[in-house]
């Protein structure tokens, strides 16, 4: 669980060994500094690339003169300064401090794997796949935030650098990164006006209507509440008599906040015009209830109970829906700590295995699922250790519990909890595959003196080869998914396939099951796309030095790019068909986030493979994604309108660059 810290501790101990006095040779002077060091007036060295360029992740060029490059030096200087300023929203002094902090953090992390430090090949632990430090474009006073290689923000940052260095469009690259940052760091509900705390009031009838939506939606996706216990708790909060008010409850408040999020998009009319970028986002609905919930939690912060834990988990989900993934991840860490303090990983001694024990199990494994998915998306260390055993939350005990569950029943050969089982199995397999693939590439990279794995195809191939072999395990998982939980396709096409075949809508299945089918398949495609995406060579040397904007048809054998593209296009096609033919995803923020994540991958493929035979399908996929963004915007997702704008700008830039290619 804490292997990340062990490596750094080993590095510190090796740095304190007796040979330390001779481990710092005198810096070799150079006759001419590289372009970046000259522009920023810092000392350069004779490394290739030099230490400063390695630290910043920029391409090191030496000896360029006026007219040698397509862009004049003033433009290069402007793009370099723009890159140092992140999304160009920080003040100069703030960026300088952030740059120094970033340099110090990166230098200390890489000192342990400097090629000159040891004459022999370094051990695998001395090279770790570097992430990216990104300045938050929303919270401009924040420190640069680190995102690991599995993060979609890490991939977005690589696209930004490519747009800047290869296409000469730093403004477009910064706009892309800035918008993607807003998908994980939107203004927190805590930052809203405190006056809103007293503005929101709901009658008992309104609250009960909202709670009825909960049993049809989140309860079937995040099964952490016992329906009977919750309803009994809710009734106990009301004083007898007409006009009575409800006593405070953090759990009830956060559940109501989630239901307000859900109902806001549900009740939005699809016939309205595109939402203005400054309009209120439906995902921020219920923020006054969220704020009140957090104040109640703070008041009782020393009280441990299952209700407190359930409140933290629902708060993390609320923040995730509000595009506050970083804040959601922090709240999730508090929830995991609370669950550990309550002893959820252990079976209470002397207590029978009854409904309460089953509820504790469901809560613990829900935390495992959320941690696996969210940490993978953000490229952060997992908060909970891997689990290689068998989890069965839909067994005979749960069948007895489900008989009393509100608004939910069995269907065919499954219960409503089987979806939860399959999500656990899938995310557990994916996080293990991701970790091993990174380790294999790191082991291969440690035997070379290079600093960028994207300039070492053999090291990348080690990880990609393992991913290809691991797909057999994921295919075996898909075959074991019950038929009732699979999303059927027209024709003789297997579920979880990337084939571009229309879906077969089962209108007779209950709504909760229809939604579970769609969300499970979207989860599968999103995770597999995330496995392959770090291995896409966005800005290799051939792409920079050639006249084309990326590798031509001879490079289309890049299997990682094609695999990521296929799963991205499958995601876009599924979301679009479901949005246009049903109401299942109208109020699910994750569907919008999946679509934007897939669109990033498709745009990245088009940037580096413009002449590829698959580029036509990729171009069509971006057009379909824009149609989905239009629908999302009509249902209250303010970020969807900006996603359309960014996607169209990138479309035009790619088409313009392709039209200028020679031949």
From Swiss-Prot:
Residues 73-88, 105-125 have a biased composition (Low complexity). Its main location: nucleus. Residues 55-64 have a biased composition (Basic residues). Keywords: DNA-binding, Metal-binding, Nucleus, Transcription, Transcription regulation, Zinc. PROSITE patterns: ZN2_CY6_FUNGAL_1, ZN2_CY6_FUNGAL_2. It holds the Pfam family Fungal_trans. Residues 1-28, 55-126 are annotated as: Disordered. GO terms for molecular function: DNA-binding transcription factor activity, RNA polymerase II-specific; RNA polymerase II cis-regulatory region sequence-specific DNA binding; zinc ion binding. GO terms for cellular component: nucleus. It is found in: Nucleus. Residues 34-60 bind DNA. SUPFAM superfamilies: Zn2/Cys6 DNA-binding domain (SSF57701). Disruption phenotype: Abolishes the production of terreic acid but not other types of secondary metabolites. InterPro entries: Fungal_SecMet_Regulators, Transcription_factor_dom_fun, Zn2-C6_fun-type_DNA-bd_sf, Zn2Cys6_DnaBD. SMART domains: Fungal_trans (SM00906), GAL4 (SM00066). One of its GO terms (biological process) is positive regulation of transcription from RNA polymerase II promoter by galactose. It comes from the Eukaryota. Residues 1-20 have a biased composition (Polar residues). Transcription factor that regulates the expression of the gene cluster that mediates the biosynthesis of terreic acid, a quinone epoxide inhibitor of Bruton's tyrosine kinase. This is Terreic acid cluster-specific transcription factor atF. The lineage of its organism: Eukaryota, Fungi, Dikarya, Ascomycota, Pezizomycotina.
